[in-house]
Amino acid sequence: MDTIIASRELQVERKHFSIEFRENERGRFLRITEEAHGRRNTVIVPSTGLNEFNAAVDAVIVAANASNASSNVTPAA
């Protein structure tokens, strides 16, 4: 049986996300669940990989923000 240590939920457009930090007899892990259009997808990240996972997500967000910033630049007249 899993014990939920911390959890957050959010709604983005038509998708519902549940982010939970859990623990069971095999260890601690992050569980990210996406529910949309009657389908559910889940990603499990062991606690030993959380720092790497966080760094990878941060890097992708920084790259996405840089891409958005460069595409929103209006040329001078």
Task: Give the ranges of each region predicted by the language model.
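Positively charged, low-complexity terminal tracts
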Residues: 1-77
